[in-house]
Every structure is written in structure tokens, then in C-alpha cells.
């Protein structure tokens, strides 16, 4: 999914003003519920210190996903930060100095690519953490002058509720061995990418 950032937005307040009443109310409710969250970007040293917690929170979300084609290695986030440096950002959500959630971003020229995230299920329900993360990603994109936010193909309805639009993607795979292998490969890809019914939301005036 792709979220185009409007040129007239210079702050999250501009974004909020363009929302319809229903979705502006939803935004304010989420912000109010997440008010107690201490949010901050994690440095390389903090990522190293919190490595196990980051993986645990990521795994918590990953294990509850409907379909999961792979599992990241335990040092994945630390390794990516070491390689991409300032082009890879992790933002932690803390409650009473305990990490209860995080999201990560890849800065790719004019596009902000959302990456993996994680959260504690109890805190997610209490604080609407996932929705707050989506709004915080939007804030980061606006304040840092990105043109688009690129989202994964999961939780499409809630992402469309903040302004993201579905974007058709194509994949071409060919096995070099045989026709049978290609037929099996096609079935595997179809299984790993099930069609989900969802309702697109239109949050803007």
C-alpha cells in the first residue's frame, strides 16, 4: 500500500485538518489513549542493549500473523542498523521505562518504507499502539519531507483508514528445472499470498 503525502502538509496538524470528522475523531481518540507512551528513537547502543526485547516483541506479532513465510534472525535489527546507519530507524514505545512496542523505518530517497514492528498484546489493546504507530509514521514522513510512505500488504483496512491506497504489485518467478516445479511454485506463491476481502476506507474530506 502507498500513502502519498500531500504537498500542503507541513505538520501532523495539517494532515489532521484534512481528515473528515469521523476520522479526525478517531485520530484524537488514538492519540489520547496513547498519551502515556514514552516514544523515542533508539540509538545503535540502545538497539544492542534491547536486542532480545525487540526480537521478542517482533516475534509476538509475527506469531499471531495469519500467514508468515519467514522468521527474522535474532540479530536482524541490530545488523540492519549497523549496515544502513541513519537510513534505518527504530522507534521504541516505553511504558514505565519498559519497552512495550517498536516500529522501524527505511529511508529510501523520497520514499519512507515502513519495516517490521512489534508490540505487547496487552499494551496494544489498552493504548491503541498499532494505530498510534501508523500516525507516528505519517508524522515522520511529513516532518522529513517524504513524498510517499510505503506499507506492506497486511492490515490493509486500518492502513487505508489513515490515507494509504492499495497498489497493485507483480511478481515473476520461474523455476529452471521443469514444468512440474513451476506448477508447484505457482501453488506455493498462491498459498503464501491469499486473497483477503477488505473494505477500503476514505478518511479525507
Language-model segment annotations:
Residues 124-139, 151:
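Conserved acetyl-CoA-binding loop-helix of GNAT-fold acetyltransferases
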Residues 1-14, 18, 95, 144-205:
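Active-site/acyl-donor-binding loops of N-acyltransferases
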